[in-house]
């Protein structure tokens, strides 16, 4: 099993890929022996306010996984948020028997939380990340980064 993490922008600039994020992600699995592709998606509203989400593709199932992005994150320091995403996604895959939905949830939550922490090393525990995921999935008025 191989996992490839690459943003849409990086795929276009580095690998000269064309098309939308779904076409690009799928093309990697057609070109290389890759089972999973994850692509983060950050929207910068201002230097200190971002939204963050991702798309996760399972080549064996030929299925894309997405969730509502974390919106209007008050960014303290974004350095390390990509590494935080990868650590969360890998945890979700390994802990939950290669469940792509869980990989997406843990990756997105871990990265979103990291954006609110100074320094390049996230200091969040598993309980905090799981609480963030639960809050993010709840309906109605919520504080997504309620820590």
Locate each region found by the language model.
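Alpha-helix N-cap/helix-start capping motif
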Residues: 8-9, 83
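A short beta-strand/loop micro-motif in the catalytic core of glycosyltransferases
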Residues: 1-8
């Amino acid at each position: 099993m191989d996992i490839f993490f690459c943003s849409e922008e990086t795929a276009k600039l580095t690998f000269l890929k064309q098309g939308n994020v779904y076409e690009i992600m799928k093309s990697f699995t057609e070109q290389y022996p890759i089972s999973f592709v994850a692509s983060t998606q950050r929207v910068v509203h201002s230097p200190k306010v971002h939204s963050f989400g991702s798309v996760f593709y399972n080549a064996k199932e030929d299925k894309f996984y997405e969730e509502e992005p974390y919106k209007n994150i008050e960014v303290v320091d974004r350095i390390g948020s990509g590494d935080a995403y990868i650590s969360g996604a890998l945890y979700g895959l390994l802990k939950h028997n290669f469940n792509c939905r869980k990989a997406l949830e843990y990756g997105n939550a871990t990265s979103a939380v990291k954006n609110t922490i100074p320094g390049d090393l996230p200091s969040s525990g598993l309980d905090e990340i799981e609480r963030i995921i639960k809050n993010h999935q709840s309906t109605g008025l919520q504080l997504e980064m309620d820590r």
